[in-house]
């Protein structure tokens, strides 16, 4: 049923709830598998425990009521928030109880951040290294110290208060999750009111969120950081509430505070330019962005988002209607355009989740790149272990979110997509063009793979033959990234025209000066050459292959020439039944499974490239005469142009710290390096095995048990094909990420 414009204006926001819809029953929750009739009967075979884990959070399988599913998801979100608050509370508690935060705050260039002390059990206190400031502990690389400094936290007592607040919020969230499922559960129409949700999320979460951060920075963060930058001891700085209550105190640091709100209401906003700045570049004392620039930035964002949160039509009959916008969105070659998408988005939470995961994943990757190019917090740029850790962290998070987007897009296509409601709209047209899309993607993957890898093979061969003049390199056959160099140059000279009042470029990665703090490079121009051109094409290759696998899984998730009735088989199925050989591993789930391996390949190349490039061309020490000595002495340009160079000069050379870490404070990384290799190798046992082999093995073991009259009541079963692949994938990724983590940190803590 379509709703006309006049009817839509009458779609009022009505907060409607059902009172006491579900009783609170610990007895019910105590029964494993209570959400499924089959599982509730208890285990007959060992498959039961696997199905219990697989289906516990698959709310679609518990009920067909969209309202009940929506309530469960809503309630689960509060549980997630509770865990996040508990984690944040724990981080602040560690900072308050087990850290050298005060020592670091007084001397952030030589004291290393530590907020973890290992108990002395059988010699484990060796892990507590001397991090400076008379403190023995484990060096941490989360960036929390730098965030606390930017917030204006000057003592451990304040961290205790933050920890207590986190605990209280955690408890409140658990209560809210229970309350909104068991006591006052929203009706389906509340969940489906897209306009109201957009208004509240844009204005409330993003708008007021930015405004509160800007307000905190202006009233607390800026004055405290200004005093810290000037060398005032933390214990002598007034407490945050004194800056809030005492305008004279603020006016000593920022004179415009004397004028109060008069410049605001008289539109004379430039009066506030002493604390809302547009300087550009980095603060030379801290090596981080100017906090007055970031306060200005968040204030501007707050205005934009609060305005954006008034754009959608709810009770007042003015503003946009999402349905109208989507249905009007069509061009001469796009058929019905976005008709039908509104109905999809308010009835399929998998479709919403897929879009949100793709967006958040991409955003996380963008954040990873901004955090080194424009370091946001004081002294984070010269803390190389933290810089490497947060880059790697945001890259992995982005990769996982994007793969999750493909997973939920596949689930949407199988469970929620209705072909009858999507005739000739853009989604239908993409599905009908899928052969062209996938075959083109396949062609570009082959092209990129052969050409990018081929450049390396050529270079390896030429170097082995001693024909260095025939190699692709900056000193022989040049393949300069001319477009990237042009972009860098534009960004270096643009601020002079676009922002004439800015003091410096947006990021020194594009060009400009070397910014050093405590004789360490915080940021400097990143020169690009043949080596970067080559590895960027490897990035293009691995990204396109990942997209090919994931997109193929989504577009062919309902049917294919091989299996026309895929939609009936579900999101994950091992094969198309007996007697149809060659149909295994073709479900949408299997595409996500394969896509995750390529995501791992892809992100690994990115973080290896970043780690080596920064050590070679950016990070290092600055002598008094201004000369820069890089950690690996600029070897990236000549070594990374061969496969052998990556193996010998990056992986092998930089693994020496983790391999030789035994007997030092870094020895845990040596053990993790070893253990994670084992976890990775263990995964291969699941990935390369046949199910029948294990089933036969189990049956002979059961025979032996029967012979001795202690056969188990629950019948043992081999893992299904899908379960085995899931276990293999989990250990492959866990082992790979653990290995990389230990390799990176042992290296960079030693040399950084």
Swiss-Prot record:
<feature type="transmembrane region" description="Helical; Name=VII">
    <location>
        <begin position="436"/>
        <end position="458"/>
    </location>
</feature>
<dbReference type="GO" id="GO:0009055">
    <property type="term" value="F:electron transfer activity"/>
</dbReference>
<feature type="transmembrane region" description="Helical; Name=X">
    <location>
        <begin position="666"/>
        <end position="688"/>
    </location>
</feature>
<dbReference type="GO" id="GO:0051539">
    <property type="term" value="F:4 iron, 4 sulfur cluster binding"/>
</dbReference>
<feature type="transmembrane region" description="Helical; Name=IV">
    <location>
        <begin position="294"/>
        <end position="312"/>
    </location>
</feature>
<dbReference type="GO" id="GO:0009535">
    <property type="term" value="C:chloroplast thylakoid membrane"/>
</dbReference>
<feature type="transmembrane region" description="Helical; Name=VI">
    <location>
        <begin position="388"/>
        <end position="414"/>
    </location>
</feature>
<feature type="transmembrane region" description="Helical; Name=III">
    <location>
        <begin position="198"/>
        <end position="222"/>
    </location>
</feature>
<keyword id="KW-0148">Chlorophyll</keyword>
<keyword id="KW-0602">Photosynthesis</keyword>
<dbReference type="GO" id="GO:0016491">
    <property type="term" value="F:oxidoreductase activity"/>
</dbReference>
<feature type="binding site">
    <location>
        <position position="694"/>
    </location>
    <ligand>
        <name>phylloquinone</name>
    </ligand>
</feature>
<keyword id="KW-0157">Chromophore</keyword>
<keyword id="KW-1133">Transmembrane helix</keyword>
<keyword id="KW-0004">4Fe-4S</keyword>
<dbReference type="InterPro" id="IPR020586">
    <property type="entry name" value="PSI_PsaA/B_CS"/>
</dbReference>
<feature type="binding site">
    <location>
        <position position="693"/>
    </location>
    <ligand>
        <name>chlorophyll a</name>
    </ligand>
</feature>
<keyword id="KW-0150">Chloroplast</keyword>
<dbReference type="InterPro" id="IPR036408">
    <property type="entry name" value="PSI_PsaA/B_sf"/>
</dbReference>
<dbReference type="GO" id="GO:0016168">
    <property type="term" value="F:chlorophyll binding"/>
</dbReference>
<feature type="binding site" description="axial binding residue">
    <location>
        <position position="677"/>
    </location>
    <ligand>
        <name>chlorophyll a'</name>
    </ligand>
</feature>
<comment type="function">
    <text>PsaA and PsaB bind P700, the primary electron donor of photosystem I (PSI), as well as the electron acceptors A0, A1 and FX. PSI is a plastocyanin/cytochrome c6-ferredoxin oxidoreductase, converting photonic excitation into a charge separation, which transfers an electron from the donor P700 chlorophyll pair to the spectroscopically characterized acceptors A0, A1, FX, FA and FB in turn. Oxidized P700 is reduced on the lumenal side of the thylakoid membrane by plastocyanin or cytochrome c6.</text>
</comment>
<keyword id="KW-0408">Iron</keyword>
<feature type="transmembrane region" description="Helical; Name=I">
    <location>
        <begin position="73"/>
        <end position="96"/>
    </location>
</feature>
<feature type="transmembrane region" description="Helical; Name=IX">
    <location>
        <begin position="591"/>
        <end position="612"/>
    </location>
</feature>
<comment type="subunit">
    <text>The PsaA/B heterodimer binds the P700 chlorophyll special pair and subsequent electron acceptors. PSI consists of a core antenna complex that captures photons, and an electron transfer chain that converts photonic excitation into a charge separation. The eukaryotic PSI reaction center is composed of at least 11 subunits.</text>
</comment>
<feature type="transmembrane region" description="Helical; Name=II">
    <location>
        <begin position="159"/>
        <end position="182"/>
    </location>
</feature>
<keyword id="KW-0813">Transport</keyword>
<dbReference type="InterPro" id="IPR001280">
    <property type="entry name" value="PSI_PsaA/B"/>
</dbReference>
<feature type="binding site" description="axial binding residue">
    <location>
        <position position="685"/>
    </location>
    <ligand>
        <name>chlorophyll a</name>
    </ligand>
</feature>
<dbReference type="InterPro" id="IPR006243">
    <property type="entry name" value="PSI_PsaA"/>
</dbReference>
<dbReference type="GO" id="GO:0000287">
    <property type="term" value="F:magnesium ion binding"/>
</dbReference>
<keyword id="KW-0934">Plastid</keyword>
<comment type="similarity">
    <text>Belongs to the PsaA/PsaB family.</text>
</comment>
<feature type="transmembrane region" description="Helical; Name=XI">
    <location>
        <begin position="726"/>
        <end position="746"/>
    </location>
</feature>
<dbReference type="Pfam" id="PF00223">
    <property type="entry name" value="PsaA_PsaB"/>
</dbReference>
<feature type="binding site">
    <location>
        <position position="584"/>
    </location>
    <ligand>
        <name>[4Fe-4S] cluster</name>
    </ligand>
</feature>
<keyword id="KW-0603">Photosystem I</keyword>
<keyword id="KW-0812">Transmembrane</keyword>
<feature type="transmembrane region" description="Helical; Name=VIII">
    <location>
        <begin position="533"/>
        <end position="551"/>
    </location>
</feature>
<keyword id="KW-0479">Metal-binding</keyword>
<feature type="binding site">
    <location>
        <position position="575"/>
    </location>
    <ligand>
        <name>[4Fe-4S] cluster</name>
    </ligand>
</feature>
